[in-house]
């Protein structure tokens, strides 16, 4: 998800004067206005002029879209507060590892291990910066996996690991395609995700695309285990 939807410049945004009070408003205020309009249309649809009905319906559609935006903003705000420190320290750690990988490769440019380490450090750094604001942050360098599971009694540590790998694969893919919200070059210039950019995102849960990425990550993990025991 590059950013959440906006209705600020659509022709069907309803009355601009009426909507101006609800752009960037809280969810409760928007819900209250939605209920007011729905009650009005339900009770007086037969007596209201067609132009008023059309205007109210457009405003209603715009309000519902703005409500979704408000919900996204709430999640982003909550996650920003909760994961600010861990993301800050992981960004520093990833940047430090990247710089070390660059230095190592400069010393031994033909070393295959150093080449691989540099590529990995690039993806890790891009992961930390571009991880979606709307998701619970999955630590790239957890002391233990319980940090990511938040100590839930029924936490699925394997699923957490698979989702991390899925996001890493997605970041790697967008890095190669040069479609990351914040490119490696911009990250090295100190850039972060812009306010209305939510970062990379997998498709909706249980979608075929996400399932495919998770399955691919799981298969690679199994292949590595097979190689180890051979």
Curated annotation (Swiss-Prot):
Its main location: nucleus. Residues 27-75 form a coiled coil. It comes from the Eukaryota. The keyword Nucleus applies. GO terms for biological process: maturation of SSU-rRNA from tricistronic rRNA transcript (SSU-rRNA, 5.8S rRNA, LSU-rRNA); nuclear RNA surveillance; re-entry into mitotic cell cycle after pheromone arrest. Residues 195-230 are annotated as: Disordered. It is found in: Nucleus, Nucleolus. One of its GO terms (cellular component) is preribosome, small subunit precursor. Residues 207-219 have a biased composition (Basic and acidic residues). Residues 220-230 have a biased composition (Acidic residues). InterPro entries: Efg1, EFG1_rRNA-proc. Keywords: Coiled coil, Nucleus, rRNA processing. It holds the Pfam family Efg1. The keyword Nucleus applies. Signal peptide: none annotated. Belongs to the EFG1 family. Involved in rRNA processing. PANTHER family: RRNA-PROCESSING PROTEIN EFG1. This is rRNA-processing protein EFG1. It comes from Vanderwaltozyma polyspora (strain ATCC 22028 / DSM 70294 / BCRC 21397 / CBS 2163 / NBRC 10782 / NRRL Y-8283 / UCD 57-17). The lineage of its organism: Eukaryota, Fungi, Dikarya, Ascomycota, Saccharomycotina.
């Amino acid at each position: 998800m590059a950013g959440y939807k906006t209705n600020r410049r659509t022709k069907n945004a309803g009355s601009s004067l009426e909507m101006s009070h609800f752009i960037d408003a809280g969810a409760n205020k928007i819900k209250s206005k939605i209920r007011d309009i729905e009650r009005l249309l339900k009770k007086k649809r037969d007596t209201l002029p067609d132009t008023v009905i059309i205007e109210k319906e457009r405003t209603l559609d715009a309000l519902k879209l703005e409500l979704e935006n408000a919900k996204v903003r709430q999640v982003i705000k909550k996650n920003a507060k909760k994961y600010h420190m861990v993301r800050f320290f992981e960004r520093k750690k990833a940047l430090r590892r990247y710089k070390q990988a660059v230095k190592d490769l400069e010393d031994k440019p033909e070393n295959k291990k150093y080449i691989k380490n540099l590529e990995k450090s690039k993806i890790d750094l891009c992961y930390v910066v571009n991880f979606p604001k709307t998701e619970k942050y999955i630590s790239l360098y957890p002391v233990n996996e319980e940090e990511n599971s938040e100590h839930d009694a029924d936490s699925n540590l394997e699923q957490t690991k698979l989702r991390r790998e899925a996001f890493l694969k997605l970041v790697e893919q967008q890095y190669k395609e040069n479609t990351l919200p914040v490119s490696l070059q911009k990250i090295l210039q100190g850039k972060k995700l812009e306010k209305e950019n939510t970062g990379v995102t997998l498709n909706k849960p249980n979608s075929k695309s996400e399932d495919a990425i998770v399955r691919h990550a799981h298969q690679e993990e199994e292949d590595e285990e097979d190689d180890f025991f051979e």
